[in-house]
Amino acid sequence: MIINQSEFSVSAVKASQYPEGGLDEIALAGRSNVGKSSFINTLLQRKNLARTSSSPGKTQTLNFYRVDSDQADFYLVDVPGYGYAKVSKKQREEFGEMIQDYLETRAYLKGLILMIDGRHEPTVDDIAMYDYAQYLNLPILLVATKMDKIKKNAFNKTEAAFRKHLNLNKDNVTFLPFSSVTKLNVDQVKDWIQARLYEE
C-alpha cells in the first residue's frame, strides 16, 4: 500500500458527528501515551498530522483521519487512550461510553489496531480492551510499540510476555513489534490494513 495523501477530517463524540461517505475504517486503541500519535504520523508519513504529547490523556475525542492510498481510501480513527488515572471518574465513564458506542455500532469499522507498550507486560486495561475486541469479533492487529528501546535479541521475550497474558493464537489476531523511530514493520502494518479494507 502506498499512501498518496492523508488529512485530519473530524473529531467526534457521538454518531451524528461521524464522517459520511461510506469509507471503511480502522480504529486505533491503546493506553494513554502508548505512542498512537507517533504511530499515525509514521504510518501516514506526515510529521505533525497527529499531535504528539508527553502528557497522557490529551486525546478526548474520536479523531478521524482520511487516508487516500493506491489501493483504497479509508479512515484511520484514533480512539481516546484508556488507563489514564488523572481524569475524573465521570470523564472515564464518558470516554468508555463513546468508545463502546463506536466499536459496537459502526458498520464501516473493519478492524482494530491495539497498541501496547512493548517495554512492559500488558496491563489489566490492555487485557480488558483485547478481550472486549475479541468479544466484538473484530480483526485485531496487536502492535508492541517503542521496540527501538528494546534490544533485538529480547523481541522474543516481549512476544512471549504478550502470549502469556493474551490469547494470540486466534485466527483474527496478528502480532507485530513496531517502532516509530526505526520504522520497524511499517509496511507490514499497511499490508494488514489493506487486507481488512472492503473485505466481505
UniProtKB/Swiss-Prot annotation:
GO cellular component term of the entry, any: cytosol
Q: Which PROSITE patterns match?
A: G_ENGB
- Magnesium as a keyword of this entry, yes or no, is yes
SUPFAM superfamilies cross-referenced by the UniProt entry:
P-loop containing nucleoside triphosphate hydrolases
Q: Which cofactor does it need?
A: Mg(2+)
Which Gene3D superfamilies does the protein's record reference?
P-loop containing nucleotide triphosphate hydrolases
Q: Name one GO biological process term.
A: division septum assembly
Q: Cell division: present as a keyword of the record? A: yes
Which Gene Ontology molecular-function terms are recorded?
A: GTP binding; metal ion binding
Which InterPro entries does UniProt cross-reference here?
G_ENGB_dom (IPR030393), GTP-bd (IPR006073), GTP-bd_ribosome_bio_YsxC (IPR019987), P-loop_NTPase (IPR027417), Small_GTP-bd (IPR005225)
* Keywords (A to Z) from UniProt: Cell cycle, Cell division, GTP-binding, Magnesium, Metal-binding, Nucleotide-binding, Septation
Q: Where does GTP bind?
A: 30-37, 57-61, 78-81, 145-148, 178-180
Instruction: Provide the binding site for Mg(2+).
Output: 37, 59
Q: To which protein family does this belong?
A: Belongs to the TRAFAC class TrmE-Era-EngA-EngB-Septin-like GTPase superfamily. EngB GTPase family.
Function, as annotated, reads:
Necessary for normal cell division and for the maintenance of normal septation.
Q: What name does the UniProt record give this protein?
A: Probable GTP-binding protein EngB
What species is this protein from?
Lactobacillus delbrueckii subsp. bulgaricus (strain ATCC 11842 / DSM 20081 / BCRC 10696 / JCM 1002 / NBRC 13953 / NCIMB 11778 / NCTC 12712 / WDCM 00102 / Lb 14)
Gene that specifies this protein: engB
